[in-house]
């Protein structure tokens, strides 16, 4: 995948994104990530070329995972996929947001 999230001139598919995320799992786990999911337009399959990749990040309950770690996760995923990434801690979602994205979520690991 190139820096625009394209493979050989075509937009990257949801399945290709998930495969890349699973390949990066060891690096993400080294950052403290215990679970990862995608949601939003890339998960639904209706993303445009400029759409970002929305991630839900899970960490161990008492870990010292910081905003810097979350930014590190974004950088790892951006490098692997060529997509702009917006990472959110799953535990930080309020009830309304959880309900809004529930149907979009695809667990990666």
How would you describe each model-predicted region?
Residues 41:
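P-loop (Walker A) phosphate-binding loop of NTP-binding proteins
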Residues 49-51, 55:
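A short, structured beta-strand/loop element
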